[in-house]
Amino acid sequence: MTEQRRSPNNRALPSPAPTSVPARARRAGGLHAGALRPLVLAMASLSAGAHAQMSGSAIPDLDQVEPVFEAAPKAPPLPVESGELVPRLAEPGKQSDAGSDAPTFIEADRMTGYSERGVELEGHAELRRDGGAIKGDKLTYDQDTDEAFAQGNVRMSRSGTLAVGPEARMKVEANEGYMLSPDYYFQQTGGSGKAERIDFLDKDRSTARHASYTTCSPDNADWYFSANRIDLDNDRQVGVAYGGVLNFFGVPIAAAPAFSFPLNDDRRSGFLPPLMGYGSRSGFDLTTPYYVNIAPNRDLTIYPRLMTERGLQLGGEYRYLGQGYNGRLRAEFLPDDKKTNSNRWAYSIQHNQNLAKGLNAYLNVNRVSDDQYPDDFNRSVSQSTLRQYTQEGGVTYNWQDFTFLARVQKFQTLRPSEPSYERVPQLNGKYIRYDLGGFDVQVEADYTRFRIPLTSTGFQQPQGERMFIQPSISYPIVRAGWYVTPKVTFNATQYQMEAASNTPTVQNNFSRVLPTMSLDSGMTFEREAPTVSRLFGVNYVQTLEPRLFYVYTPFRDQSQFPLFDTVQSDFGYGQIFSENPFTGYDRVADNNKLTGGLTTRLIEADTGIERFRGTIAQRYDFTGQRVQINGTLADPKAGFSDLLAATTIQMFRGYYLDAGVQYNPDSDRINYGNVAVSYRPESRKVINAGYRYRRPTSVTDNTAIDQFEVSSQWPITRRAYGIARFAFDLAASQMVDALAGVEYAADCWVGRVVYQRFRNTTQGYTGRVFLQVEFRGLSKIGSNPLNILRLNVPGYEPVSAKPVPTTQFDHYE
């Protein structure tokens, strides 16, 4: 036995013979300190269960039209707005391919060798192999048994994971051993925890007893997850926790006697985080979704939903994806609603099918049991106010410049809304070819059979068939600084009406052929803006962009024509430079109009950012427009249209202004106006204010608009943020909607409480309470208000937990 002093050069000991160790285990090599990492990562997954399968709310939104399915067999990732649920960390660092040939390095203040059989290390003892390290006050390594035994301030590290305890024993190559009373830290997540003991059974299996995990500071853990025992199997990528409890400020808020969880990103069956909230129509609302991973391309989510004012609702969503097809089926059913004493239900079917190259079929069917269903059960304002659900199926074909659509489209319309026309069927074809010898050519042909249910008063509106063909040809001439585009369009339409009992004398056949000629032109001038540049200290370029648009269409009386899908467009920039002020194909306005517009912009010369835009436009009608949406004017008047003006200003950092006005020079009054201002000095600081005004007109809508709204997100303290919105209708003297809430960001968790009240379509106001706690690096519980906050507070940014800053050198070994 010889004694050696610490040498400036580390000594490399021969590796033990591989004997009967499997090749796979030999390739893994090294110390099993890395096994601690999936252990604690598993703890981070316990509360979320099969977290990777679903996002946001588990309750489906039975919307009118929705994309069917993400084009990937893998479950969709959690959206950014859901916050940091269970962290998706990389797997432990790749092991050296050296395997059993990897050298073992030792270092200490004093080393005592045993005839090449082993070594005893004292004082800053360290053993390193294949990326892992064991350190301690004293360490003994037996080369024959390949066993390392460490005592006193033992530290095991690998791939950013550090475990500290009083004692550890490991068979290095076999990855067998234990560590007593370990405290562990994770550089990637900032998480930490402790256990009574960790046993490493082999390279894949380990057991932790009385283990805990938190991303809070170990000295001040607001929350932590604990379990009596956790069994991990890295080969099967599954873990089982026994007696798991989530504690928040010392209070248990979630628990389970035993459950399994995944150790990687693969989907696995299990419970998803519960959703909780309160609504004035539903009472206390609790949903506990359960995810079933049927196959890589199929899954099922079952979501029982308990509402104290309604009862127990059962819902489900089935998703599938195959070669050339995908879709989802969703349904929910509430037997014997406590308030209505009736069964309430909703379902949705979406399917996409590829039939051949360029040929696809689709199905989109949505229905609810009654008119009040969206008001009573949907969680969002947009879904609560939805009054029309689509039932549609069709076939599409795309080939080069040609597209074709054949579909049947029906609607379920909820009262008090009136029914819409249904297309049973519609056949539509389009051909679009650009730069055909310098010409742009477009041809659209359509056949539609229109049907409509009786109105609420029992009136039968006109029904019939419509066929049209609309070819157009244009010749764009584009040069540097200017363009001219002449265009000719023909609209040929044929109607075959059904005799209606309400209007037996109405003519049944109509036809119309009308040409439209237009000429669009514009120029762009640029110059430097030295005065503005000196004022703001930035080099600016100013543009001046005049535009002239002329359109001519002869008059044709269309007062007897039906209105299947046509409405009057709102007067604005999109309409004033268009060939037809009506959307749809049932009205073609007579035109002899010239529109002039002028736009000026200020653009940063170095960055190209537009800081200012001002636009003004007006149209002159040489003869007056006789064709109206509901008839024909006998004596139209020539003259100028309303004057349109708008501006967008972002000249000062953090300040934004958008404003527009529609001014009638004849009556000297404003028919429409809006202004919106926003102050955003920095992240999570925003104040918005807006005002809208519209004078009622017989052309568009007799409903006046006179509304203002304010919204804001602003810090109250260093960690607390207030969110609010208020919208009021001055014309009706009533509140439109209001929202108030508080977000609190601690080191390792975020809390949100939000109250929303809005006017629904039928029975006054609806109020909802959202309460959510988000545990950094673990999961979140409660109802998610983030989408509502983004929708109602422009510029809103979710707060996130503010952990103590760390670096890659923290816990560095």
Curated annotation (Swiss-Prot):
Give the signal peptide range.
Answer: 1-52
Origin, by domain of life? Bacteria
Cite the entry's keywords alphabetically: Cell outer membrane, Membrane, Signal
The record's similarity note reads: Belongs to the LptD family.
InterPro entries in the record: LipoPS_assembly_LptD, LptD, LptD_C
Q: Return the HAMAP family for the record.
A: LPS_assembly_LptD
The name this protein carries in UniProt is LPS-assembly protein LptD
Q: Which stretches does the entry tag as region Disordered? A: 1-29
Q: Name one GO biological process term.
A: lipopolysaccharide transport
Q: How does it assemble?
A: Component of the lipopolysaccharide transport and assembly complex. Interacts with LptE and LptA.
Gene Ontology CC annotations of this record: cell outer membrane; transporter complex
UniProt-annotated location(s): Cell outer membrane
Q: Fetch the Pfam families from UniProt.
A: LptD
Protein's job: Together with LptE, is involved in the assembly of lipopolysaccharide (LPS) at the surface of the outer membrane.
